């Protein structure tokens, strides 16, 4: 199935049902009074995470989703039924933004988690709501309010513990093939990897972690060069990054300069992502003599002013991969188990959150009734005993 990690959709919450004007008319019950019922609220629109989905490709074909409208009120104080909510299934790891304002509505990181993205309209009020001692036969009602309409941007962020980044042909896909059962495409030309790949690394006795491989970065990726930097967002939820460096690049470039390019692109894309824990992994040590490899590694560390973890591996022969994976597992076990989204949900205000507080107040001054007029305020009634 085609991997799609971004989609735009439009959601339309249901309109609220209108209130009803009605009066009780039964034999032997004169002046029965108002009995018009309220309308029903419009249905809301929700996103729900589904662990059985792994792509947003379905949203390329269906882009509009709407909830049901609330039913109108009826006489005999009958309230209209509420509109049915619309629930849209999305993959676990989906982030939802308002496409017009850019605000983050929320992240769906657990199976079954729901997020309201559009609130249904508030129900209209029937004339029974407006009866009072001075307004015994009200002929006013309110209509239901329209449901919210939002343009949404859905972004799928892979849920992985470890993320790999580096230049094309650094050996990231080969590393994943050697430590997990994943089989991403491997070849001797740049950009063999076109979409992110996931692999599960098992160290036995229930100790495992998920590793993500994204397409390689090149200089200017943040400005759109190569495949761009948009795949970097899949690393935002990773807890540690493995910066893979090719000790003997096929194009003859300097490994130290290549490492600086990756760090520069990382900082341009997201300073928060650049501040994540990062380990250096020098790959293809089998292509150089040990002394030559050490010289290159020291030159890279000096250029980066690096004092963090350093690992030497040969992914194709699995040399050094077990040590690296074991250290990764131990590092992850020491971290807190709770997951904190990188970008917290912003405070989202829905259109009709406070409508019910003001709906009646706005109509309190309405004088359209049968029993009262402004002239009545100036009328003086004198009672005399005959």
From Swiss-Prot:
Its cofactor is Mg(2+). The keyword ATP-binding does not apply. InterPro entries: G_OBG, GTP-bd, GTP-bd_Obg/CgtA, GTP1-OBG_CS, GTP1_OBG_dom, GTP1_OBG_dom_sf, OBG_GTPase, P-loop_NTPase. GTP binds at residues 166-173, 191-195, 213-216, 283-286, 314-316. Mg(2+) binds at residues 173, 193. Keywords: Cytoplasm, GTP-binding, Hydrolase, Magnesium, Metal-binding, Nucleotide-binding. GO terms for cellular component: cytoplasm. One of its GO terms (molecular function) is GTPase activity. Its EC number is 3.6.5.-. Residues 160-333 form the OBG-type G domain. It is an enzyme of class 3 (hydrolase). It is found in: Cytoplasm. One of its GO terms (biological process) is ribosome biogenesis. The keyword DNA repair does not apply. Its main location: cytoplasm. Residues 1-159 form the Obg domain. CDD domains: Obg. Pfam families: GTP1_OBG, MMR_HSR1. Belongs to the TRAFAC class OBG-HflX-like GTPase superfamily. OBG GTPase family. An essential GTPase which binds GTP, GDP and possibly (p)ppGpp with moderate affinity, with high nucleotide exchange rates and a fairly low GTP hydrolysis rate. Plays a role in control of the cell cycle, stress response, ribosome biogenesis and in those bacteria that undergo differentiation, in morphogenesis control. Monomer. This is GTPase Obg. It comes from Psychromonas ingrahamii (strain DSM 17664 / CCUG 51855 / 37).
């Amino acid at each position: 199935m085609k991997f799609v990690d971004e989609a735009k959709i439009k959601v339309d919450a249901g309109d609220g049902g209108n209130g009803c004007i009605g009066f009780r008319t039964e034999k032997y019950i004169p002046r029965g009074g108002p009995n018009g019922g309220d309308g029903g609220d419009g249905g809301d629109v929700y996103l729900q995470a589904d662990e059985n989905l792994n792509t947003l490709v379905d949203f390329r074909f269906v882009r509009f989703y709407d909830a049901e409208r609330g039913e109108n009120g009826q006489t005999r104080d009958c309230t209209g039924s509420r509109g049915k909510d619309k629930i849209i299934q999305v993959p676990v790891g989906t982030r939802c933004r308002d496409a017009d304002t850019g605000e983050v509505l929320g992240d769906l990181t657990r199976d079954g988690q729901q997020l309201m993205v559009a609130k249904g309209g508030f129900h209209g009020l029937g004339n029974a709501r407006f009866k009072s001692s001075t307004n015994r036969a009200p002929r006013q009602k309110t209509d239901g309010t329209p449901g919210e309409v939002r343009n949404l941007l859905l972004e799928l962020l892979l849920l992985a513990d470890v993320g790999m980044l580096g230049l094309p042909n650094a050996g990231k896909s080969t590393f994943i093939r050697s430590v997990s059962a994943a089989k991403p495409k491997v070849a001797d030309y740049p950009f063999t990897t076109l979409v992110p790949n996931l692999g599960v690394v098992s160290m036995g006795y229930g100790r495992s972690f998920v590793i993500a491989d994204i397409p390689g970065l090149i200089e200017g990726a943040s400005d759109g060069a190569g495949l761009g930097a948009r795949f970097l967002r899949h690393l935002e939820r990773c807890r540690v990054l493995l910066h893979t460096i090719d000790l003997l690049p096929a194009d003859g470039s300097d490994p130290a300069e290549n490492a600086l390019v990756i760090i520069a692109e990382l900082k341009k894309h997201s300073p928060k992502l650049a501040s994540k824990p990062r380990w250096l992994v020098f790959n293809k040590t089998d292509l150089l003599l040990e002394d030559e490899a050490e010289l290159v590694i020291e030159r890279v560390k000096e250029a980066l002013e690096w004092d963090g973890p350093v690992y030497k591996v040969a992914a194709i022969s699995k040399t050094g991969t077990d040590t690296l994976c074991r250290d990764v597992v131990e590092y992850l076990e020491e971290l807190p188990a709770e997951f904190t989204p990188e970008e917290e949900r912003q405070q989202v205000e829905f259109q009709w959150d406070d409508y019910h507080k003001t709906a009646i107040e706005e109509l309190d001054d309405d004088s359209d009734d049968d029993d009262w007029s402004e002239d009545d305020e100036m009328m003086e009634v004198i009672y005399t005993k005959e």
